[in-house]
Amino acid sequence: MKKQITFLIAFAFVFSLACQTLVPPPKREGTIIADCADILRAVNGVQPVDIPESLIESGVKQGGEFDPNDYFKALTHLSMRDGYALDYVYPIDFLGSFPMLYPRPVDQPPYVSAADVPEGVKLGNFRDQLAIEDVEQGYFEYAVMDIMASQFYLVWHANYNDLLIVCDKDAANEIVDDTNSHDFGMKFDLAQQAQVRALTNVEPVVKLTDDSAIVEIVTFTKWGGFFRRTYTISRSFPHEVDVKGENLVEYDCGIMF
């Protein structure tokens, strides 16, 4: 019986590949972001690896911690609007600490801890003060910033924030191969592997209309699988942003922190 199931899955995979060859996916509208992998490497390159012990213990910044404005060295088509800097506080949460990013007026001293934020004061959403260069790359970089900006200094449960941007089919296949070669949770079964191998239109693409930018990217999380994430961003400030997700391949590592 097991051999029959394996044969059927293998047949389904081969049949799927044949269908892709005979009936190729429809041509996509927009501009493919060919340097996706280079951009992600640049962002990963500025993100810190280790969390300062003093920050974990107290939640108080003492100087020398990560400066999130360094993101704009990697994402060169983004910046904060005039009069604002990107900043964060680090509330201590023993179930999982993570940075809370906010747009800080440049004439306002930074808060060194979450306890310094006056009661009733809302820090605001940093995305609301992002300046986006009105080109395809700018809107792609917005999506990168939206996903990756808070993925540093993560502790315990905060590591559920593991969303990855998948730049092409090779990257998708590498995720499967890497997952199945390690002993971290569940592996991709044969059916899931076949679904990933059959994915099409993985590369990020940006389409500009008269008033909007539409960004399509594929993402992966160990707690959900592969998704197609579509951003619709108005091209004029203030930018209205709508995000929709479509699950392409379901997967769950089964790990619970």
Task: Tell where the protein language model's regions lie, with residue ranges.
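C-terminal motif of bacterial Sec signal peptides marking the signal peptidase cleavage site
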Residues: 16-18
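Bacterial signal peptide processing site
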Residues: 20-22
